[in-house]
Regions:
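Serine-hydrolase catalytic machinery in alpha/beta-hydrolase-like enzymes
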Residues: 1-88
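Short glycine-enriched nucleophile-adjacent loop
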Residues: 96-112, 124
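Acidic catalytic loop of the alpha/beta-hydrolase fold
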Residues: 132-134, 170-175, 198-200
């Protein structure tokens, strides 16, 4: 990306995931391993009991994303502390879902006179994502990140008028292609790219060129 002239900033998600969890199996508490990756982090959590429990991630029912406000605050602070310019958000898996939430905030902020923080984001590249099931209050109604009722967020059902590129693989079993397609359908004129692989970001020339072409087209409109 840097060779194409784009500077990448890797922001760290605020929630540290535990390496082990305790679960109840037939009345007996058993310790399980959540993987070997140390410093694994999340933009939000699904359970107050077990921070590593992601069993609700693909449930297509409204829910509260625990700790989301901390992530929104982190992005807001970053944007406020940096100069105006061309910003794009890129996220993978849960990061792509967080990108969906940020896209909602971008479009909501456009309707608020004088609001110009999230509006710095001009486009989104969302890889292997799924639609957010967390309802947020619009900036002109309350602090972003607060939980709201469906009635107060009715206009959030409108398609998001933000340039977007949705990347996924038809062999993905962690976040099936259908979820990424549902996410893309929440945007106006989404662009899509199927890399044909599983739940991963392929490091190949074709994918990089597709992303750079998309970013170049968005930048040319500024």
């Amino acid at each position: 990306m840097r060779r194409a002239g784009y500077e990448c900033e890797y922001l760290e998600a605020p929630h540290l995931l535990p390496l082990t969890s305790e679960v109840d199996i037939d009345g007996e508490v058993v310790q399980i391993t959540n993987g070997k990756r140390e410093n694994a982090r999340a933009w939000f959590l699904y359970s107050n009991i077990d921070n590593a429990d992601a069993s609700m991630a693909l449930k297509e029912t409204p829910m509260e994303y625990i700790g989301l406000e901390a992530s929104i605050s982190r992005l807001k602070t970053y944007l406020e502390q940096n100069s105006d310019g061309f910003y794009a958000v890129l996220g993978f898996s849960q990061g792509a879902t967080f990108g969906h939430i940020l896209s909602q905030l971008v479009c909501a902020e456009k309707r608020v006179l004088g609001a110009n923080t999230f509006c710095k984001i001009k486009c989104a590249v969302l890889l292997s994502g799924f639609p957010s099931m967390h309802n947020i209050l619009l900036p002109d109604r309350a602090t972003s990140g607060s939980v709201a009722t469906n009635d107060s967020c009715s206009d959030m059902n409108d398609k998001l008028d933000l340039r977007s590129l949705h990347i996924y693989g038809d062999k993905d079993t962690s976040v099936p292609k259908s979820f990424a397609e549902k996410l893309s359908n929440l945007f106006v004129n989404p662009e899509t790219y199927d890399h044909g692989k599983s739940h991963m970001i392929p490091h190949n020339k074709a994918l990089i060129e597709r992303v750079v072409t998309f970013l170049d087209s968005c930048y040319s409109l500024e």
